[in-house]
Amino acid sequence: MHDAALIIGLVGVLIFAAHLFEAIFRHTRIPDVLPLVVIGILLGPLLGIATPTSFGAVGPIFTVVTFVLILFEAGTGLSISSLRKTYQETLILTTVTFILNVALIGVAAHYLTGLGWVRSFILASVVGGISSAIIAPMLGQLNMQEDGKAVLLLESSITDVFCVIAALSFIDISDFGDITQFDIGLAMGKMIASFLLAAMMGTVGAFGWSYIFNKVRGLQNSMFTTAAIVFVIFGIAEWLGYSGAIAALAFGITLGNISSLRLPKLYSGFNTDFSGLNISEKAFFAELVFILKTFFFVYIGISLQLANWWLIVVGLILTALIFIIRLPVVKFTVLKSTPVTDASMLAIVIPRGLAAAVLASIPFQQGMEGGDIIQNVAYAIILISIIITSLLVFLVDKTRFSRFYAWFFPNLGKQSKAVD
């Protein structure tokens, strides 16, 4: 009974702490993700008060539920006009970044860890992309224009798929033992299908749901029915082998812009008046995501495993390489009209997170030689990238460090106005 009382009390403290960290952010510009992850590390790896096994099967399910709602809620805040303006830029930035990350991190990991080439590229693929689960809840706190936020959110969602397909493909190569037996065309086909069909499912699902939404609103306690539909679409997409994350994001984007989207009437008796989220519903989901992300980031901190100090140093070196790679990629791929502040954020807001943590555990669980090294280095990169991202956001926003990026991006647009 005392343990239950302690846990309930801790839940209340964490919620109050999350609001405090958000208030601190408004003054310091340090994202609240950092102190929440640090709390998790204190409770988990350092003090041993909690471990991922303490949550049993609930922990992984909770992370997926939170991840889905975070993507959906972030999608509702994106405008179609911003997506139209930034999708080409996003695809170029995402693809170039991911390819360079996998190539250079793979080579560096091979020489720093002694892993074989294929296993080094497994590690590189695992940490090759930024985390939508970390970035989506940070967007509202970043000093960026809407177009820049759209680029970050889309990139993080796309690279989650890149990481999954690439990492599993290299694991297949490791199983084959011969790269010539690997079908790269099949892997590319899976990737394209995962994007397009998942996006189609999310979009069609949003139109279908919005058509009956007004009728559902008449039911008692119907606020959470939209979230239920998001879970259904995510589950179906994943079950079919597509990207549930892309489906959830597409659902949110479509539902958030439904008032500006019109389908032609199929026949005169068909009413095409679609309904999106109202103000109270948006506020409900924003508050729900705020509470869930609080426990989500603490859980990530608890889940991190930092057992070998040399591998932590390797993680630090590889994380530094990730940030170095990002600078020239942003410089040569973003539009010339991009404000310097937006380009700066695109260069520094590149944390690793949920997808990397899940993928890093697969080689170890399969008993692959070097699987423990892959997992430990990946966990170190996740932690260090979150810390560096948070600190750089503060430095760029509050100190003269921003002058470095103004110097590095001399040909880009003028700086955008600060956001409170």
Identify the role of each PLM range.
Residues 1-420:
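Transmembrane helical cores of multi-pass secondary ion antiporters/exchangers
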